[in-house]
Amino acid sequence: MRRILALQILFLVVAFVAAAQPVAPTNVVAFSGDQSAIVHWDLDPGPNLAGYNVYRSLSSGGPFTQLNTGLLTTLGYCDLNVSDGQTYYYQVTAVNATSQTSPPSATVSTLPNPFPSDDAFLDYLQEANFDYFWYAGNPANGLIPDRSTTGSACSIASVGFGLTAIGIAIDHGWITRDQGAARVLTTLNTFWNGPQGTNASGDIGYNGWFYHFLDMNLATRSGSSELSSIDTTLLLGGILYAKQYFNGTNATETSIQTTASAIFNRVNWSWMAPDVPGTNGVRMGWLPDSGFSTFGDWIGYDEGMLIYLLGIGATSNSLPAASWSYWTSGYVWASYYGYSFVTFPPLFGHEYSHCWVDFRHVGDTYMNNENCTYFENSHRAALAQQAYCIADPDGWAGYNSLIWGLTASDDPSGYSAHGAPPAENDNGTIAFTAAGGAMAFAPEISLPSLKNFYTNGKKKFWTQYGFIDAFNLSAAWYDNAELGIDQGPIVIMIENYRNQNVCRLFMQNPEIQNGLQLAGFVPLPFMPLTAQAQPAQSTLTLAWAATSNRTYQVEYSTNLISWFTSPTGEVTATNAVASWTDTGPPGTLTVPFSDTARFYRVFQYGTP
């Protein structure tokens, strides 16, 4: 009798728990741009959650109308049916598996308006893209999904971009420093404490390296993914940035610093370079069952550059300095569409390392011999790709000066590394991260494209996480997902364009400074200048002592913090004095003398 009574009580408890009404979503926020509004909220940890509904009203007191037609499984909603100048009010409810609905959340409001400036547009673009890392991530362990679709595994490279985006978000006021620090420490603890070993499953990595994809909840190897040298390195980029950003003395921030150092110092770089002596090539990956046998080396120009710089600069189990020469031995310098540069067709290879490393005023032996820098090399690659899209030799729909951007992305057939010549792999697919990731070195073509994509395409392109991954007008195809490795460079490279804060902090790490020095990078000299202004003609001429046939680059700033490369400021001297005249666009991005102050500097390309 007691057993029967106990079972009855148990059944009643189970039934009561299953029938419990969900709690109202918390920390609901809303923000808006030109003719769009975005709403986000925190994850409901309650049992049997099925999804969410979003409601809108023109009045704080209602009535509220449901916007979504099916339950939302993400923590955000993008409202594209709004008008500028009208305040909109939003509420969110949670729904459980038995279709019970929570009380409505607190009401939030936002007022869409046209962007008053380019900075306002960039703020909106960055915040929306940052939200992918904050709301799509798992707050319990800090992991970030590879893509926004349901069931995605974690991409450890996405985590690296996300750690960097958190610092940017704090600087812009989208989250607090305490919120960001707590999420970062949670993330670092996941990677530090996760089991390392040679098991086929159940480990997060081995020899300090990490698996490319991880289970979002277990933080262990997902499927048959490889131990990835490049994805681990992109993760380390974010970890080393976080180490410098969170430089406080409280317990959380000091733990971030020590854990970040521990994760980096545990990486066995030399183990990932098992080739015969003299080659020093880093392998692309390793598998528990077959080792390195199915993977080639990183050689030649692409996103792998950061692997060698950090590996050479490491203080334990480091790569030999000679490995940099092995890496550069695979470079191909060529000319396409009027620009000469080290080639790599998809633009991501010209962008990823630049998210963290400031290559503007340093050069290695290879680049110094070409009178170039890696920063300028990426600039030329972006310009050449835009020129290719303008020419559109294959006749893809839509290509022009504003619709360009070929890189690794989703496409109508799956996922592919798209690019322009020399190894052209173009099927008409444009990815927003290509232009967004080029902002730091090609703002003169990237910013107009991003604004065009939003202004003329937001009904198909814009979501609660910023731009979708890609589109293909020839196939009438528009992606249904966002990717962490593509949203991240948009946030980061816009920030590097605006203030260079990410690079400035990352470059404070002794590991990268040591790596650059051992790889043979040297600082490029700045030239003493004289200036003569002609305000009536809105021009200004700079002059400096020069060496004939040497090449120089003009940069300018309005605040001595954010420096921009003049698109017309590359000057090759013909005698002992070189000069350059600022006449406004396209020499600079704003008309001269419209600023309160303007500052110039000139540096010399090539071996000092």
Model-assigned labels for residue ranges:
Residues 6-15:
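Bacterial N-terminal signal peptides
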Residues 1-4:
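Positively charged n-region of N-terminal signal peptides that target proteins for export
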Residues 27-28, 525-608:
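Short, composition-biased motifs enriched in small/polar/acidic residues
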Residues 50-85, 97-108, 562-591:
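Recognizes extended acidic, P/S/T-rich segments that occur
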Residues 42-63, 547-555:
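Solvent-exposed loop/turn segments flanking beta-strands in beta-repeat/beta-sandwich domains
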Residues 20-50, 84, 96-116, 528-536, ...:
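Pro/Thr/Ser/Gly-rich low-complexity, intrinsically disordered linker/stalk tracts
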